[in-house]
């Protein structure tokens, strides 16, 4: 069957009950009551739509049904005239159809406005000139009818008639222009406006100018305003030099009361103008919608729009940061998270104080919020706030003094919030020497109450690294001793009870009650000591035990904390003896030295005793022994030089490769620059860098693509057109690269396909060319998708002329991001009605088509790495020798992004990274991150080293929250490795 034959069947309507013959229908139409005649008309319409022509019933309908005044009958009659064939095989109008003109004229001038409206809507669908011509005057008369329903449909009828037969209504534009200037109904005005837009744009421009002068644009109806916005955007794209005429119109419509109109108007301004005023107005409109609208989906869409604006107009949005953050007061948890994430990207010198104040307010809200059911979401939001505070402090250092007292109270918590806070404090101590003294004092005050082992470890390292004065060093030593008192160290009550239970269980006896010594007064007044069973619970006993903070962590069996404790004590004692010996009494230094030795000996004894909660590892044991040795001989010049050089090395590392370690979005290289703005886009940074020997381009004397790009850079009016042209060319080239040939030119049919992946479906564009000199009929594609893909609908059947071609598009639903295969073949019918088949190559849908590079901070990466269970490890053994080249090869092959970018400027760091420098670095470890279109995460860790032969080997580990993602990435990595070998 040819494709043209299917064009006549628009839809199929099911018939219920027994089939009806023509005699019964004719009898019902002639002699039945209103209900019977209506049922007969409905049956006629259904039968004709389903492929049973009913032209032989036209005269019966004209004679017996058309004169009736029943409204429902009138409606069905018009439906019948719409679907019935009104022309013969040669295309001439049937003689019977001339008879309905008088009835249509009566309906167009009927006293009842409903019937008039039905007739006018029918006139919109008539395509026969002979029927339309005698009714034009009747249609035009309805433009001045008193009822808006009639006028609304009359404008539509005039529009359709003028579009099909402009010679029948040459003054249609003038009539509609007069109509729209006098019309008060919004829908009728909108229909008239759409007609003028299509038929006479100049009159639309005149109409808009009159509206702009009368200042009535903001008071128009929402539907008409939406049409005006679409027209303005279309005209500006067609002729950018008239932009000023329409931007003022859009500014007026921005004051509309309808949120949909305001959103569309703001989006149009963003797409057609780069003026700061227009962008600022669009941003303020989005922010106002974010504040006033209650629908969650709409607010999320607006936040996404603002985030898209940030990539191009970051500096303009920075001025509106206060308005954006005000949405936090009445937002849901998801809205709050997105607003904070957006606000972090907009922090600058001018607005960082506003941002920090908003974060303070939100932290207080999180602390006092008890009614939230989703505690996990609240915890994630708290971590996000603290991470945002870190970013703000890194970009506005002088705000740290106000922020640190606020976040210090979160050091006490055992979740990840404490680690985020101590990371912030670490950066402040390293980058802002003026705040070290006060910050270290606050740390010393809070050390006793910290319970998280990782936080305690970092705090100890900070105290050992940044405490330099003699008084502070002595105070820290006393603090550490007091924190671990009372001595000697003993296991916690919980550990003692556990050991007792294990011992009693091993003996098989019943557990003895806990005994307590008490004093009893006898009858003669004497005092005696007696042991009685204790009724205290385990919790009470633990509450009385000194197991808080550092002591509790150490006695609880986490012996790794002893290593940073020993390192801190040794650093403090070495500094005390080498740099402050002249200002401190010898007895005081000796006392501090003895106290440190005594404390470490006690820690070492406790960690190696038989009743300890666990076993100390060899590395920690060795570090404690080494610290004792260093404290015993603290005046060694080697130790003093080592401590000082380690501090200098830390400063040097921060200055050189701070940008590499800035996975959380910090730029340490710019910490002293007063012009630091928030994290700008990569394009902006590239524009700022310009070599002194770059040639100057003169637009007037250049040709080709270079001149176009220069015009794009300096000419604001042509930027939209130039960008659109370049983007379309790039999209075409990308699509061309994805096109895969599936058959050869020697086959009767040549076929090629390109796959486009969307979020939940796949679109395959097929190109089929007839390589023969014969007409091939019934050409169709048979598809068999494998995997999670399902075919939405069967492809249509086509007829291809000799050496002709056809394009077919098919859609497949996708359930999960995994590699799939589409098996296909092309069936056709030759000139002698013989059936043929061309088996095509398989179309592979790679999992990488679903993957997009994404951003992720280092802390988020660690959290996800610990949380996700699905892991796939791929061993590496390659002939490549360049580490950076291999990392980039993996990154491009897996569509991932490095968490920590390469250093580009420092040759020493680069050579260290590549392992070609004198320092002999021969290994690389880096993390990569990506997200699928389904929202699934993919985390990669690449660890490689260079062996003695110069070849690279190592491991790539993949973790994901879904099994298909981890499996697919592992398969892709194996393919990449095989390509290198081959």
UniProtKB/Swiss-Prot annotation:
A GO MF label: structural molecule activity
The keyword Repeat is annotated on this UniProt entry: yes
InterPro entries linked: ARM-like (IPR011989), ARM-type_fold (IPR016024), Clathrin/coatomer_adapt-like_N (IPR002553), Coatomer_bsu_C (IPR011710), COPB1 (IPR016460), COPB1_appendage_platform_dom (IPR029446)
Disulfide bonds: none
Membrane-protein topology: Peripheral membrane protein
GO cellular component, one term: Golgi membrane
Pfam families hit by this protein: Adaptin_N (PF01602), Coatamer_beta_C (PF07718), Coatomer_b_Cpla (PF14806)
GO BP term, pick one: intracellular protein transport
Alphabetical UniProt keywords: Cytoplasm, Cytoplasmic vesicle, ER-Golgi transport, Golgi apparatus, Membrane, Protein transport, Repeat, Transport
Domain of life: Eukaryota
Mapped HEAT repeat ranges: 16-53, 130-167, 241-278, 317-352
Compartment(s): Cytoplasm; Golgi apparatus membrane; Cytoplasmic vesicle, COPI-coated vesicle membrane
Protein transport keyword on record: yes
Function summary: The coatomer is a cytosolic protein complex that binds to dilysine motifs and reversibly associates with Golgi non-clathrin-coated vesicles, which further mediate biosynthetic protein transport from the ER, via the Golgi up to the trans Golgi network. Coatomer complex is required for budding from Golgi membranes, and is essential for the retrograde Golgi-to-ER transport of dilysine-tagged proteins.
PANTHER family in the cross-refs: COATOMER SUBUNIT BETA
Protein's name in the database: Coatomer subunit beta
Native species: Trypanosoma brucei brucei
